[in-house]
Every structure is written in structure tokens, then in C-alpha cells.
Amino acid sequence: MKFIANLGFAVRSYLAGLGLGARLFIRLIGLFGSNMRRFGLVRDQVHFLGNYSLAIIAVSGLFVGFVLSLQGYYTLQRYGSSEALGLLVALSLVRELGPVVSALLFAGRAGTSLTAEIGLMKAGEQLSAMDMMAVDPVRRILGPRFWGGIIALPLLSAVFSAVGILGGWMVGVLMIGVDAGSFWSQMQGGVDVWKDVGNGVVKSIVFGVTVTFVALLQGYEAQPTPEGVSRATTKTVVVASLAVLGLDFILTAMMFSI
């Protein structure tokens, strides 16, 4: 009997959290016009979140490009296709690794920062104080951060892919000795702007919505204690990372089936 009661309590808590999340998401989407009219707040968040993650995104992209070029060259060399190295590096980064790895790094860096910021504001009763002063905290605090994250992640993903391609060129052309003309011409001829780059942009936007919303929701729902905020930041990384990987599979399957 106790097991059934605990199970019912867990299901009820899960459904209540799901309902709160759905209401908050709908509210944030509905604030698009209001937040865009006060774009300065959104711009500040894009600047903050972008600067917060730019260094780790750029360095990670460079080393991913190094590894892709090394692995790709020795694999293609077996089949006499080493001139296609540029195409392999570009497609791998633009289609998959750029959006996915950028989103995972964004979740660990900027996502935890958002969760901790909102959680500490809740613990310090700043959100409650704003309510008492007739200032909507969702509109004033959460909304600009939500749209700022959605704008920042595609830009960071583009930086990751560009730096990764540069890293692939450095290893493939300067270190290994692949012909530079073949490297760039294969890339230029084989990468489709709408199908490949467009799909990568769509993925990065979806991941931006997912990671930013998870981070804000966890901070908004965090228990107003130091331990509660700590658990919320940890949960942000876990939930956002799993959501990104799951959505990547779904989006890839949909895009290749069209």
C-alpha cells in the first residue's frame, strides 16, 4: 500500500512539474513581441551568454577539427579519396558536430549560469519582491534570457563549425600535405547551403530553445536553498544534454527522410 502511495505521489509530482513547464514555455513564447520591443535586454543577454561560452566553444571547435582531419585523412587514404577530406570535415561539423557539441558545451557553461542566477534570485526573494512591486519576473527576467539564449547558440554553433574547419585545414593541408585547392573545392562543391547548412541552423535553434528553457525552468523551480540551487544546476546539465542528444536523433531522422 505504501508503494502505491509513493508511486502515486511521484506521478502527481511529475505531472505537476510537466504542467508548470508547459505553462512557462507557452508564456515565454508569447513574450516574443514584448521582448523584441525591448531588444536592449535581449541584446545584453546575447552578449553575456555568447561571451561566457565563446572561448570554450572556439577552443573545442579547433581541436575537434584537428581530430576530424587526422581521422578522416587516414580513413579516406585507404580508398584513395584523400582529396575529399575538406568535404568530410565540413559536413561532419556543419550537419552534426557543430550544433550538438556547441549545445552540450552551452548547457554546461551558460546553462548552469542561468540556472544558478535564477535560483539565487529566488532564494534571495528577489522574484517575490518584483511580484510585490507589480513587476512580472517572467517578462522582465526570464523572457530576455530565453530569447537571448535562442539567438546566442546558433551564433556559437557557427563559430564552432568555422573554427573546426580552420583546424581541419591546418592539420590536413599544413601538417599532412593535402592539396589546398582540392580541400576547398571539394568542400565548396559538396556542401549544400540549404540542405546541409540550413539543417545545422535549424538544429542549433531547436537546441537553443531546449537548453535555455531547461536552464530557466530548473532555476525557476529550484528550492530556495544553497543545496536546492546546486541540485538544480546539476540537473540542468543532465536534462539538457540528454534532451539535445535525443532531439538530434529525431531531427536527423526527419531531415534525411524529407
Name what the model sees in each region:
Residues 118-143, 226-229:
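Short cytoplasmic-facing helical segments at TM-TM junctions of multi-pass membrane proteins
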Residues 229, 235-252:
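Final/C-terminal transmembrane alpha-helix of multipass membrane proteins
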Residues 1-42, 218-223:
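Short, membrane-interfacial amphipathic segments enriched in basic
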Residues 136-157, 232, 236:
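Start (N-cap) of specific transmembrane helices in multi-pass transporter permeases
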Residues 56-71, 250:
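Hydrophobic alpha-helical transmembrane segments of multi-pass membrane transport/permease proteins
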Residues 34-59, 238-241:
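Membrane-interface helix starts
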Residues 71-94, 162-205, 209, 213-233, ...:
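Membrane-interfacial helix-loop-helix connectors in multipass membrane proteins
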Residues 48, 52, 56, 60, ...:
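Loop-to-helix entry region at the N-terminal start of transmembrane alpha-helices
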